Amino acid sequence: MNVLVINSGSSSIKYQLIDMEREVPLCSGLVERIGEPMGKLTHKIRPDAEGEEKLTFEQPFTNHVEGMKRVVELITDADKGVIKDKSEIGAIGHRVLLGGEEIKQSVRIDDWAKGVIRDYIPLGPLHNPANLAGIEVAEELFPGLPNVGVFDTEFHQSMPAKAYLYPLPIELYEELKIRRYGFHGTSHRYITKRTAQYLGKPLDELNIITCHLGNGCSMAAVKNGKCVDTTMGITPLEGLMMGTRCGDIDPAIVPFLMEKKNLSPAEADTLMNKQSGLKGVCGMNDMRDLHAARENGNERAQLAFEMFTYRIKKYIGAYYAVLGRVDAVVFTAGIGENDDFVRAEVCAGLDSLGIAVDPARNAVRNGQPRHISPDGSRVAVLVVPTNEELEIAQATLDVLKG
């Protein structure tokens, strides 16, 4: 079966059509700047394979429907298409940010599921409306085709109350559902399953610490194959230092800044989400630029690097204590998979925990799951490339199979 995976943003649509018999993407792409005077569509045929072909188009897209119609035209094009017509698509899987406590696993989209997505718009004001728009576009363009929602929060629903509750008046949880939800769950779940396969260990016996490090960063403590804690909270702002997000800070800083800098709640939110993290400390949010600046003696870039890796190291220690036994520390996503400097610095000095990195292995880049720890290490340190689209497609099939 071919599964179309859609990740709909407020002004974008990211998509991938996957042949699930071979687990191979037939095409992928991104529609950008929807609603602006001029939009852009980047379409790849046979992505990440030999003979990949990339097509770029610039044209206005008034709304998500227009953008998705153009995608369908490309997918089924007589010359460049990868399928003959829409009937060769068996199902559509949607990435959805927040499903709250009501949705603990991927679900077939119906009125109830759409109602839950709407109910959590106050906690996901940017993503949930956009995700819902993507679902409604798919329902319009592919009538009768099953749509499945795969939620970022699903994997973390196994956390115990002691991990997900905040020490605020309990009435706030009961009334407003203020709690830790966690995000990047699709990636953490995929990495957990791939690590079990790679190590040849039963999933229900696997204890690992997963580190999803990209422009957004999160970690998870996984015990017996299930998440028991994660760094992100009620929103993706909590936890690690990120590209533009501050991560953990003293909450009292927020009202202090609002008073001293005369900030509105929205302005304070923007400061913490879009002007902080690596960007706030050194003016750069791309780790590659930051490394170049470090090499040129930029002290703020060096400080940002040290702060970033220190936070990850600190959470490894915390999650080691939570798990008691750790089979592996696993790095994934853009920085986690490709940045040997970050991995080396994070693991430096953790020998007493059985965590160490072999410099030669750490320098290898091959796009495959691999050990970067020395032979005989008590804890395996691994790099495992993530594939959220494949995980969404697989979850979609699992729902349809029942």
UniProtKB/Swiss-Prot annotation:
Reactions catalysed according to its record: acetate + ATP = acetyl phosphate + ADP
Cofactor annotation remark: Mg(2+). Can also accept Mn(2+).
Keyword annotations from UniProtKB, A to Z: ATP-binding, Cytoplasm, Kinase, Magnesium, Metal-binding, Nucleotide-binding, Transferase
Gene Ontology cellular component annotations, sorted alphabetically: cytoplasm
Annotated residues for binding of substrate: 95
Function: Catalyzes the formation of acetyl phosphate from acetate and ATP. Can also catalyze the reverse reaction.
Protein name per the record: Acetate kinase
Species: Nitratidesulfovibrio vulgaris (strain DP4)
Gene: ackA
